[in-house]
A protein has these predicted regions:
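Non-catalytic amphipathic alpha-helical adaptor/oligomerization segments
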Residues: 1-132, 136-144, 153-156
Length: 156
């Protein structure tokens, strides 16, 4: 999955997470019920769509909108407090970091708020904000992949 994301293989990355995150048969095959990493797969699914951004994707939805749909399916994830903490730390390295954080809840990580911040960066062609969004997204992927590795390697 990491390799696919690094080479812009969003469709291929999507095909990997779909059976783990969608309960119905799809073109990628039957669903894989009761996966220990189901919640993480939903989280990955949402992030793949966030990377689609303003592009039209699955089911005629734009990436940002589809990301919000999948974050809704994911619900709360125990990584959210760590993501919020790290996102705040990353913002300290940016001149407009406090402004960036004003769009994000200080109480709890809201992935939809961050998705809309990414959308704003693209819409306004704000290169510095886009750089911040990419840095936070990369951190988020890193935490999520660590979590998936921990979950799948602890299953015996």
């Amino acid at each position: 999955m990491v390799l696919l994301l690094n080479i812009q293989g969003l469709d291929e990355a999507h095909d990997i997470v779909l059976p783990y995150s969608w309960p119905l048969p799809a073109f990628t095959g039957p669903p894989i019920p009761n996966s220990p990493a189901c919640k993480e797969s939903q989280y990955c699914h949402a992030m793949v769509h966030r990377l689609e951004g303003p592009n039209l994707g699955e089911l005629g939805m734009y990436g940002y909108d589809n990301a919000c749909f999948w974050f809704g399916k994911t619900g709360y994830h125990h990584l959210f407090p760590k993501v919020l903490k790290r996102c705040t730390e990353i913002a300290e390295n940016y001149e407009d970091g406090k402004t960036y954080l004003s769009y994000i809840s200080k109480e709890a990580w809201n992935p939809d708020d961050f998705t809309m911040l990414c959308k704003k960066a693209i819409a306004n062609n704000d290169k510095e904000l886009w750089k911040y969004c990419n840095e936070v997204t990369n951190m988020e992927w890193h935490l999520l992949f660590q979590e998936c590795n921990k979950i799948t390697n602890s299953v015996r």
